[in-house]
Amino acid sequence: TVDSWEGLAKSLANGETDIALMGPWGYVLANHFADAQVVSTILYQGKPEYFAIMVTHPGSGLNSVQDLIGPTGKGRTFAFGDKGSTSGYLIPLHFFMQQGIDPEKHFGRVVYTKHQAIQTQVTAGQIDAGADFNRNRSTMIDQGLIQAERSKVIWQSAPLPNDAVAVSAALFKDKALVKRVQDALQEVGPQLKIQP
């Protein structure tokens, strides 16, 4: 069983896996280590991209990302997603690094958890701020899991590519098979929208 993006990259490299659905960071690793190639991408809400975001509770006193990285944010609690998450860890960490901020030193406590837990804990005021992705926040609001007015977006990344369907380097050489895979994915796409 593959349980990490690194494991999936190795599985594609050694021929155990021929086709995989993976997030942006997983694809970067798989392309780098196994020369995996994208053959399709997923459209969510009709769009090929999404955004990393940082959220806070409106009562936290953190009204902007400048507050978060400035003296007002020092000593606060910040939550990242797991360390393999593009939107929950890598992109926000990159932003902090660009600002000269080491999260482990700037914040009083840094936690690593699941995307839904970040939103739930921020809205409950259990953590001051956290990293997530826009679709997760929207979905949780739509499903009534959190209230929009209790989760304030204070930062948004540049667009990030959605999940990719990638194939091994060996499979990619078979252009006829790649075309059949692409056609099959396109054919089942509407059915997945009806019955996910």
Residue ranges, per PLM feature:
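Bilobed "Venus flytrap"/periplasmic-binding protein-like clamshell domains
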Residues: 1, 25, 48-124, 135
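Sec-exported extracytoplasmic/periplasmic mature domains
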Residues: 13, 17, 32, 70-73, ...
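Extracytoplasmic/secreted cell-surface and envelope-processing proteins
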Residues: 9, 30, 88-90, 119-121, ...
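A ligand-binding cleft/hinge motif common to bilobed small-molecule-binding domains
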Residues: 21-34, 97-98, 123-124, 128-149
